Amino acid sequence: ENNVLLKEKTGEDIAVKRILDLREFPGTEWESLLVHDIKEIIEDKEIDVVVETMGGTSPAFEFVRDALLSGKHVTTSNKALVAAHGTELLKIAREKNVNFFFEASVGGGIPIIRTLTESYAGEHFKEITGILNGTTNYILTKMDAEGESFEKALATAQDLGYAERNPEADVEGHDTCRKIAILSSLATGKEVNFENIHTEGITKI
């Protein structure tokens, strides 16, 4: 259904040609698409766009870098990758005249990155504030509105699937830190290293 709409709007017939995974999925509809070596994707001239869904910075960075260098467009929601290597990857994309899209790395479905880079391209920013992490927003709301303890609110968030089993990235502020680094870099036009941002979690509230 989505593919039909995309073809109507773009004129392009979009199809998945390869899926990179170390695992095997025998008997599945995508079994024939699986490859275990990134080179099979990088060297395939018929593949125009690479979607990175691995997470983390390595080997995601190396794979994305090589895809851009080979002239392929790349899209990702990997905030850790963008926060650590976004400037370098954008530079490569510009040099190769391809797109490196990472809208989904901050704000989910909110088009905040495109808004910053396009709608407010001529503006000067003094401050960026906002709720950048849904898990901590849920926990703090439960604590404030219903008087729940941090531990109970976190457990509820995990049961509902809002929080990971290992919630450290969210509750210690690492996720938000990476997101604000990305937004700050885009707003100021300067590389902001997430490791230089003072970060506090919510575990002691």
Residue ranges and their predicted role:
Residues 54, 59-70, 77-118:
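Rossmann-fold NAD(P)-binding glycine/threonine-rich loop
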Residues 14, 36, 45, 84, ...:
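Conserved active-site and cofactor/substrate-binding residues in soluble primary-metabolism enzymes
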Residues 112-125, 136-151, 178-192:
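Oxidoreductase and adenylate-handling cofactor-binding alpha/beta cores
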Residues 125-136, 198:
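NAD(P)-dependent dehydrogenases' Rossmann-like dinucleotide-binding region
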Residues 152-205:
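Substrate-binding/catalytic subdomain of NAD(P)-dependent oxidoreductase enzymes
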Residues 1-70:
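N-terminal glycine-/serine-/threonine-rich beta1-alpha1-beta2 phosphate-ribose binding loop
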Residues 34-36, 52, 75-77, 100-104, ...:
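General beta-strand structural signal in soluble alpha/beta enzymes
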